[in-house]
């Protein structure tokens, strides 16, 4: 497995692969891998001759009061896990490589970023879109693999790729979960044992919503009201947002007659967790 730090070296490496007719798959990450990351890498391995994984904790997608400085990092552990699942290249750039002196250019995706995380984390998606656009130009992948747990992020990146005529496929993969249903996240390490139990309210909310949907309920307000009451009864929780939105526009819907996603962000203690379920799709929670 090769480790690349410099942008020009990554670009040269990928260009040589493309000229040789080799297919590149790419998994962008912020590191501190869990099984969800590894599932994305396994999918990338199936789809490519060369699998590139980036590890970069992108400062432009964190707000001033967020967890940039304490975000978990362990490169040695990550590189070992990556090698075990067959990663060919880890791209591990510095801030100076990604955002050099006099950097001035940012990518803004408009409508699909105005709700949910876009409301509660101003500037977040500008940072996400910018770093992904830059990474796509550096790695030059044929396909990039993203998890559906960050559903709004996936929609945003697909919109950017379509609007800017980027020549790559964006692949969304199902959320990887712990055995008890909690969506895997690098931030789960922040949770105390008591908070870890309370965090199950997110996945249980999805199950509640799916049950109501399967029983024929299509009124978004009634589904949200029952979930809100449940989460508010769980210790150490505070709802950031709880909404049912269109899967294409990410705007609130009143009825689930169109393709819709339940999206929620909940603070458990001081840790902000997200989860979602697209109604009508499989929900891999027991």
UniProtKB/Swiss-Prot annotation:
Pathway assigned to this chain's UniProt record: Cofactor biosynthesis; (R)-pantothenate biosynthesis; (R)-pantothenate from (R)-pantoate and beta-alanine: step 1/1
Residues annotated for beta-alanine binding in this entry: 61
Source lineage: Bacteria, Pseudomonadati, Thermodesulfobacteriota, Syntrophia, Syntrophales
GO molecular function: ATP binding; pantoate-beta-alanine ligase activity
Principal location: cytoplasm
Designated name of the protein: Pantothenate synthetase
Binding of (R)-pantoate, residues: 61, 153
Enzyme class at the top of the EC tree: ligase
Pfam families in the record: Pantoate_ligase
Xref: HAMAP family: PanC
Keyword annotations: ATP-binding, Cytoplasm, Ligase, Nucleotide-binding, Pantothenate biosynthesis
Annotated ATP binding sites: 30-37, 147-150, 184-187
Entries under PANTHER family matching the protein: CYTIDYLATE KINASE/PANTOATE-BETA-ALANINE LIGASE, PANTOATE--BETA-ALANINE LIGASE
Catalytic activity: (R)-pantoate + beta-alanine + ATP = (R)-pantothenate + AMP + diphosphate + H(+)
Family listed: Belongs to the pantothenate synthetase family.
